Amino acid sequence: MAKEFVSIQIRHDMEARTLELTQEDYWVKAVERFKEFLPRAGPKERLVPLSPADERLLVEPSEEEMAEASHLPYTSLLGVCQYPSAYTRLEMRYAMSILSRFRTKWGKKHFEILVKTLEYGYATRKMGLKYDGNQAGDKTNVLEGYADSSLSLPRSQGCRTVVMNNAAVSFTSKRHTTTDDSTAAAELTEQYLCACDVEGYRNLMQEIGLMQDGPTVIWQDNQAAIQIAMNRGALAKKTRAMEMRVMTIRNKIEDMKVVPMYLRTSEMIADIGTKALDPKLFIYLRDKLCGYGKE
C-alpha cells in the first residue's frame, strides 16, 4: 500500500489490523506558508478549531472592516484548512462550515479566528482517522449511524456520521435546506438523511461480501424524533409537515435496514458538527469520532 497519496499519509499495520490516515506534512507546509500571520514564537497550542466565544464574534462585517481586511489572504487560508477537514480532520468540518460563510466578506476578526483554526490543525497534526479491525464482540465491520441537529433560524445546522471499526467512514456537517419549526423536526430531518446514508453503505457492504446482521442502529439524543420515527406516542400522528421524511424512515425501519435508538448528548459524537463546544467535550467526542477514544 502507498505510504502517501494526495498529501495523506497512510499507515497500515496488517498484524495489528489498524489503518491510520493523517496529514502531518500538510500542516507543517501550511504553517510555513502563512507564518507571517503567526506569532514569532510559532503557532500557539489550540485545543479546539473554533471556540464558543469566537463563534459569537462571527457576524457580518461592516464596509469599513471589510476594506481594512481586504489585503488578508482569507480565501487562500480557508481553502488550505478546508482540504484536511474533508478527508482526515472531520472534527474541523463545523468550523469550516461557519467560516466559509464569510468567504466573500470578511473582517480582521474573521481572519484572526481562521488563523486559530490553522494553529489547531498544526497542534494536532499527528491526528487523523484511525480504524481498528479488532472490535470487541461482534462489532467488527458493523455500521453505526449518529444524527444530531441544532435548531436555529432560518435553517438548522445538522450533522450526521456513519462509523465502522472505531472511526467515521462518512461525516456531514451543514445547514438544512428547509426551515424546521421545532427541535424534533430538525432532529428528524437529520435522522432521515442519516438513514439514507446508512442504506447506501449497507448496499456497498453487501456488494463486497460484508453483510450486516440486522438493522443498523442510528443513535439520536432526541426522544421525540425517535418516537415519531417508530410510530409511537402522542407525537406520532402529528407529522403532516414531515410526512415524506417520516414515511421514508418508517419504511426503512419496517424493512429492517435501520433502527433509531437513544443516546445521551454527552456521548453524541455528531454533536461536534452542530455547534462550537468547550475543549473538554470537544476532545472527548473528537477522539471517539476519529478512532482515538478509549472504549
Say what each PLM segment does:
Residues M1-E295:
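Long, low-complexity, charge-biased intrinsically disordered regions
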